[in-house]
């Protein structure tokens, strides 16, 4: 919340909260609750999900939740959506209460969300209330070229995670621009680039924060649990 307030004072436009599960160093497992708390303690900055991992939720649940947020905080909510589970297979199985399998249809889930957020004429037997006529902005998140095709086909904004796949960013952007189809949401492509950055009062402190993040990446690759270390004298050895 403190960081969101600082960014709001600096006139930043949006602040996003991720969805991750079974990570001790990450507290954003209940994404919508954190978003609501930040919205309640700020005045104008847009706050959203970066993002909701659709395999973990039904479109109806997502539409009800974010339709409620949009009703409480009009024009301040973003709904970024992704196709990954945001966790390991074992944890995903517990979320599903069955063996995890990539069985959901990402594009169909997004189309269903658009219907739930749309007008009365677009609704079916089941409605998301509140949600109707809220038109919550949907942004496609991804770290691969496949998500670029989806965003382009649906004419939606696209946010690429370069902190996960920096080598694919240029290709993904090219695909999105080349295949983009205008929609009722966008006349032209809208691309957001997510980058990893560390800021501090001094260069030394920023460097220290950066090395902590690097250590966290190493621990993730090694499938090590626990909080990130604040300092590691063997960092260079581990990096090699």
What name fits each language-model region?
Residues 93, 99-127, 168-240:
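An alpha-helical appendage that flanks or caps ligand/catalytic pockets
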Residues 1, 55-118, 158, 166:
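Flexible, glycine-rich active-site loops centered on histidine and acidic residues
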Residues 148-167, 172-173, 177:
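A conserved active-site cap/scaffold subdomain adjacent to cofactor or substrate pockets
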Residues 15-17, 47-50, 77-81, 137-141, ...:
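Hydrophobic faces of well-ordered beta-strands that scaffold small-molecule active sites
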Residues 7, 11, 19, 38, ...:
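Conserved, mostly hydrophobic/aromatic
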């Amino acid at each position: 919340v403190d960081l969101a307030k600082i960014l709001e004072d600096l006139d930043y436009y949006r602040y996003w909260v991720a969805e991750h599960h079974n990570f001790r160093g990450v507290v954003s497992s209940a994404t919508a609750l954190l978003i609501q708390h930040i919205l309640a303690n700020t005045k104008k900055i847009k706050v959203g999900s970066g993002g909701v991992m659709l395999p973990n939720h039904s479109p109806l649940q997502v539409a009800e939740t974010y339709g409620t947020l949009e009703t409480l905080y009009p024009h301040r909510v973003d709904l970024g959506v992704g196709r990954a589970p945001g966790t390991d297979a074992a944890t995903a199985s517990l979320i599903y209460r069955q063996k995890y399998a990539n069985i959901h249809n990402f594009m169909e889930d997004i189309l269903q969300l658009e219907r739930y957020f749309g007008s009365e004429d677009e609704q079916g037997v089941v409605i998301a209330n509140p949600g109707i006529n809220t038109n919550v902005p949907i942004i496609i998140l991804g770290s691969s070229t496949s998500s670029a095709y989806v965003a382009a086909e649906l004419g939606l904004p696209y946010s690429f995670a370069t902190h996960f796949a920096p080598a694919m960013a240029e290709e993904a952007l090219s695909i999105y621009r080349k295949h983009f189809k205008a929609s009722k949401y966008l006349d032209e492509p809208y691309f957001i680039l997510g980058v990893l950055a560390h800021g501090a009062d001094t260069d030394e402190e920023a460097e220290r924060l950066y090395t902590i993040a690097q250590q966290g990446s190493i621990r993730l690759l090694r499938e090590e649990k626990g909080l990130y270390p604040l300092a590691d004298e063997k960092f260079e050895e581990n990096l090699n």
